[in-house]
Amino acid sequence: MERIKELRNLMSQSRTREILTKTTVDHMAIIKKYTSGRQEKNPSLRMKWMMAMKYPITADRRITEMIPERNEQGQTLWSKMNDAGSDRVMVSPLAVTWWNRNGPMTSTVHYPKIYKTYFEKVERLKHGTFGPVHFRNQVKIRRRVDINPGHADLSAKEAQDVIMEVVFPNEVGARILTSESQLTITKEKKEELQDCKISPLMVAYMLERELVRKTRFLPVAGGTSSVYIEVLHLTQGTCWEQMYTPGGEVRNDDVDQSLIIAARNIVRRAAVSADPLASLLEMCHSTQIGGTRMVDILRQNPTEEQAVNICKAAMGLRISSSFSFAGFTFKRTSGSSVKREEEVLTGNLQTLKIRVHEGYEEFTMVGKRATAILRKTTRRLIQLIVSGRDEQSIAEAIIVAMVFSQEDCMIKAVRGDLNFVNRANQRLNPMHQLLRHFQKDAKVLFQNWGIEHIDNVMGMIGILPDMTPSTEMSMRGVRVSKMGVDEYSSAERVVVSIDRFLRVRDQRGNVLLSPEEVSETQGTEKLTITYSSSMMWEINGPESVLVNTYQWIIRNWETVKIQWSQNPTMLYNKIEFEPFQSLVPKAIRGQYSGFVRTLFQQMRDVLGTFDTTQIIKLLPFAAAPPKQSRMQFSSLTVNVRGSGMRILVRGNSPVFNYNKTTKRLTVLGKDAGTLTEDPDEGTAGVESAVLRGFLILGKEDRRYGPALSINELSNLAKGEKANVLIGQGDVVLVMKRKRDSSILTDSQTATKRIRMAIN
């Protein structure tokens, strides 16, 4: 108050006012401070001071011909004085108002296209719903979040090339547009922006917003998808939150969400196949998400999720150096350890071989609903500070940390045998065995852990074995904090290796990820996921397996047919028949297979019994390892729709129905395709290509000249005979048919005739 009085007193004297307004500032240090460098030192003051002047804005000289000197109120809009140091004129802020009201109108057609991200944001907010405000403590943790909804996922470099190509197509400079997304976007934008009058620089800025993912490290207590982040300032404060439902979704969030679901499904499926790594790669390469190849998305998308990271590792991409255990992301913040195998005894006297980490280490643990700081040393937890949304989440984090600590009292708390298995029916490793055990029931673990008196520390309270909070006592070393633990901020990526069982290791050999870490959570993808791989047929249940198997046979009928006659064993071992086996009752699989294989052999041996539909119908049953038995079947059972349904060996059934006139096959009422007997030239099976339109007369006859190749056959005239070289290097005599009508039956009798002609 004294100071203010003094200042008032000074200001009342005219001399003071004169000094402050008229005299120059001539202290060198001050002049230096405010004039060195291009950076404005006090932007808000500068702005206020400038706007207080009469003509704070400079404009191109042409403006004087387009704007009157005075407005309707008689206020001067521009000065006759030139701007010092340029050939521009000085104008008043009122000139801007006049221009906005009375200036020329240009076409606005490009605005929504250029400012697309803004227009869409307005729509989302218009249709969004804001709920009540709740006052409560907010546990916010800093996470790396996407702050820019509605973007494509191009890298900065890719986007730069696209922008240059769209905005400055004639500029010189090497631009190579390689990825599919780059080409599509460039084409689309060039069309949209024809005759666009908006300044190229503005267009470039806006395109950047649309093409590149921008991330920031922000404190968040709720949803992390970009449509929530754009309203972060409206939905959460230090002590309040406001409920909000976005008024629309954006493709980038949908891609992230669908990518996670696809990756989880693929890793889970690959883990149970004979060669997990090969299967995983095959599935990643043959899957599309929202019409884009999954491998392209993986290369561009920075999502950090366990299954996604396993897929990235398999593709040889770099991933984050943190590791996963029990759904928590662990990042070592200090210390180091060496690993050593040790045998320990559980409370049930079962021996476990665990890899013990020897040495002092500190970690941050970040999960979906809880976070923690963990300090540990060899097989001992020193301190655990947890924060979480609720009691349940806090308990989950405590269990994980206790298991991770490898303490003896945790291992001794095991009651009963540990025999958890993964999806492939293999035993889990000991650490995951312990984890599963205590996740089912942690009562004994918490009771045996031990409790201690605690000091009163700001922001921290104790927690008892029954998960009630306390200010006096707590489980040994464990405290609950009001503050969350920030996610690891660095976006650094490291080179990793992956083994055939999908275990991902860093270059020091530490396991960062394994299929056990992949969440079992099921969700519904926002974008269509198309799995072309037969391994994923079962994802939509037994019916889908059935339909897909038969669709596959029909689509590939030309090659299947040749293999059926020449190399059946190879055909039976095809990976596409693997999912089907799970539909056939286990006890009878072998007998069915033996029966069908015998039936097929008879067809091959006995002329004229070749029956296309029957082969298609029974083929999947022949894929199981056959048991020899004298059993005959008139129908075969498959387990779909929760019960056994019958496929008739001869004739149609609801499961398998072939309409001879339309040549359409329906499986369980679903269309499974049409049997076309006109193969694509060149890709068709060798024999079929020979036979369609030719009659096989018998063994080679030298009188008809040297053997022709299949391609030379097309030159024969109707009724002309020739020797021809077929599949296995055998030569047979054929005659080109005189009539086309009988062509269809050729393929059915041909295989027989070839066999007879050769034998």
Curated annotation (Swiss-Prot):
Alphabetic keyword roster: Cap snatching, Eukaryotic host gene expression shutoff by virus, Eukaryotic host transcription shutoff by virus, Host gene expression shutoff by virus, Host mitochondrion, Host nucleus, Host-virus interaction, Inhibition of host innate immune response by virus, Inhibition of host MAVS by virus, Inhibition of host RLR pathway by virus, Inhibition of host RNA polymerase II by virus, mRNA capping, mRNA processing, Viral immunoevasion, Viral transcription, Virion
Site (Mammalian adaptation): K627
UniProt motif Nuclear localization signal: location: 736-739
GO cellular component: host cell mitochondrion; host cell nucleus; virion component
Location of the protein in the cell: Virion; Host nucleus; Host mitochondrion
Regions annotated as coiled coil: none
One GO BP: DNA-templated transcription
Pfam families per UniProt: Flu_PB2_1st, Flu_PB2_2nd, Flu_PB2_3rd, Flu_PB2_4th, Flu_PB2_5th, Flu_PB2_6th, Flu_PB2_7th
Record GO terms (molecular function): RNA binding; RNA-directed RNA polymerase activity
InterPro entries: Flu_PB2_2nd, Flu_PB2_6th, Flu_PB2_C, Flu_PB2_CAP-bd, Flu_PB2_middle, Flu_PB2_N, INV_PB2, PB2_helical
Entry-linked SUPFAM superfamilies: PB2 C-terminal domain-like (SSF160453)
Stated family: Belongs to the influenza viruses PB2 family.
Main function: Plays an essential role in transcription initiation and cap-stealing mechanism, in which cellular capped pre-mRNAs are used to generate primers for viral transcription. Recognizes and binds the 7-methylguanosine-containing cap of the target pre-RNA which is subsequently cleaved after 10-13 nucleotides by the viral protein PA. Plays a role in the initiation of the viral genome replication and modulates the activity of the ribonucleoprotein (RNP) complex.
Subunit structure: Influenza RNA polymerase is composed of three subunits: PB1, PB2 and PA. Interacts (via N-terminus) with PB1 (via C-terminus). Interacts with nucleoprotein NP (via N-terminus). Interacts (via N-terminus) with host MAVS (via N-terminus); this interaction inhibits host innate immune response.
Protein name per its UniProtKB record: Polymerase basic protein 2
